[in-house]
Amino acid sequence: SFTGDKKLLYKANYCLRTALRILLPIATFRATNPDELYAQLKRLDWSAWMRSGDSFAFDTVVYSEAFTHSKYVGYRAKDALVDYFVERGENRPSVRLDNPDRLFHIHIAHDEVTLALDSSGESLHKRGWRVAQTEAPMSEVLAAGILMLADWDGSTDFVDPMCGSGTLLIEAALIARGIAPGSFRRSFAFQRWLDYDAGLFDLVKEEAASLLRPFEHHIYGSDNSIEAVKVARYNVRTAGLDDIITVAHRAMQDCPAPEAPVLLVTNPPYGERLRPRSIEDLYRMIGERLKHNYAGSKAWIIAYKPEHFDSIGLRQNVRIKMLNGSLEC
């Protein structure tokens, strides 16, 4: 969590590369049962955050023995909000699960309740540049996080020899050029808030644009699937980055050795889609290519079992545990 003003909230949505949502807490209280929850919520001044004609939805996360069903928490919250407006003689607000005017989050830990407004809308991993995808594409925020862990700063060429739909390539380009990840999005939820300041958001975007920088190197992607290559090229063009990203149709073992040290980051096909013997052979091939073609370069390889690294056969400097969706890697 962090504390800041309205400008920082806008900037967090527009510029953060590894956040999924930016929530603004608006009320905290205690409740030991659903009736107390209803009473506490109904007591709030909902007109400070929405009009009766606005649509809304609740997202709930519950860690409590007193509240065993998160959906029921959402129902009681909905009743409290609707009753607040109806009893004031206003229109009955409508629930809309898809892209509501206001999305509220309720988090309950034991008897501590936090009500927050979602300022983002769609998850921030949905940058806006992905117009096509391959099977099980990597999340944009995961890709950005891995690149930040790898200390990618655009000071060398970048290589992903198993690029799939191009997520790592594009996120690497955004970082290298200092492009804000939110610059591709059509909108954010805070733009529909009652206190939205369009001029302030324009200032945030102008300040982000002032941080753009030249990238003097190149980003190379390849994949042995022609369909993946087509998807990656399409996404690269949509992002307007085809001047610094080249995507080729070739397998990793056919990739030429770079002329100078590079940063290589790749997410090989994982276990659910390959036979055990195929996985072992794949990672052994990766190790051989790294040894012969990428001496002096830095490589970050995503793997899903410790033995995958054993198959690579090279000494590792660091291993970092993370989640790719529901898969530990």
Regions found by a protein language model. Name each.
Residues 1-20, 60, 64-72, 108-157, ...:
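S-adenosyl-L-methionine
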Residues 1-102:
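Non-catalytic nucleic-acid substrate-recognition regions in nucleic-acid-modifying enzymes
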Residues 53-56, 156, 262:
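Nucleotide donor/acceptor-binding cores
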Residues 54-57, 219, 298-299:
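Hydrophobic beta-strand segments of well-ordered beta-sheets in folded domains
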Residues 103-107:
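Short, surface-exposed charged micro-motifs
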Residues 138-257, 272, 280-282:
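Conserved S-adenosyl-L-methionine
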Residues 250-329:
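C-terminal catalytic and target-recognition region of SAM-dependent MTase-like enzymes
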